[in-house]
Amino acid sequence: MKKIIAITGFAMLGGGLREGLSLLVTWPQHFWITCLINIVGAFVLSLITNLLPARLPVSEDIVIGMSVGFVGSFTTFSTFTFETLQSFQSGHSVLALSYVAASLGLGLLAGLAGNFLSTYWLPKEEF
């Protein structure tokens, strides 16, 4: 039950932050904020899952709440998919493909960067 409460609580924070950022940005191509959020989420998820349990005395429920709840609600694959399909359907194929390439490529690089920083900040025997 503690795990569900942690996930729910952190999901409210992550979803609220995501919506807040979406409201602040008024780019004509609003989907780039989704791309940026997903890239930041990939980086943060790597840090949370690798670094947090080793550096701080937090329970597994908190780590799962932060990763599944906060990062899961902050990032969004469904919005990414919907926005990509909208771009294709409105005839913006190059833009849609650029969005997919940027999201996947930069997301993977952000995850790798999070893993790299985790190994840098942790003693070798802990990683």
UniProtKB/Swiss-Prot annotation:
Show the InterPro entries listed in the entry: FluC
Query: Its GO biological process terms?
Result: cellular detoxification of fluoride
Alphabetic keyword roster: Cell membrane, Ion channel, Ion transport, Membrane, Metal-binding, Sodium, Transmembrane, Transmembrane helix, Transport
Pfam families cross-referenced by the UniProt entry: CRCB
Residues at which Na(+) binds: G72, T75
> Which family does the similarity line name?
Belongs to the fluoride channel Fluc/FEX (TC 1.A.43) family.
- Protein purpose: Fluoride-specific ion channel. Important for reducing fluoride concentration in the cell, thus reducing its toxicity.
PANTHER family in the record: FLUORIDE EXPORT PROTEIN 1-RELATED
**Name listed for the protein in its UniProt record:** Fluoride-specific ion channel FluC 2
Q: Which organism is it from?
A: Lactiplantibacillus plantarum (strain ATCC BAA-793 / NCIMB 8826 / WCFS1) (Lactobacillus plantarum)
